[in-house]
Amino acid sequence: MMLEVKDLNVSYGAIKALKGISFNVDEGEIITLIGSNGAGKTTTLHSVSNLIKKQSGTIFFEGNDITTLTADKIVRQHLIQVPDGRRIFANLSVKENLELGAFLRNDKAEIKRDLEKVFVLFPRLKERLKQNAGTLSGGEQQMLAMGRALM
């Protein structure tokens, strides 16, 4: 099991935003969270990443309990969100954007290997390495946001 969420409960004051949410994601599996505005999709993701406080519930990533880890430690576990709107650094190059994805890491050889993995997944980014990210098409910007998350 890659990600396991058990009995997640989140409240905003008196409003119960999540009530006992549980789900599993296996390696290689793709799931979707579907619901109307205010249904709790973003709250669920923010809870998993510990960007908001949970009242109760447990979260396991790759077999490790990450329920109480801080958001930066969760990122170090390689559990990353790529939000809507891409949120790239438009005035920086594609290369600089990708490098920012590895800012918490020190192992240069590992960073280089991960960069090559990104280029295998998104060869277009390698072609545009020196280009300003803001000049990429919308799809290319989404590739860049995902590539940065993989770094």
Which residue ranges define each predicted feature?
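Helix-to-loop junction immediately C-terminal to a conserved catalytic motif
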Residues: 49
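ABC-type ATPase nucleotide-binding domains, specifically the catalytic core motifs of the NBD
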Residues: 13, 69, 94-110, 121-123
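Conserved structural motif at the start of ABC-family nucleotide-binding domains
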Residues: 3-5, 18
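Conserved ABC transporter NBD signature motif
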Residues: 57-64, 77, 110-115
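Short beta-strand immediately N-terminal to the Walker A/P-loop
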Residues: 17, 31-32, 81
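The feature captures the beta-strand-to-loop junction immediately N-terminal to the Walker
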Residues: 34-36
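Conserved ABC ATPase signature
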Residues: 132-136, 140
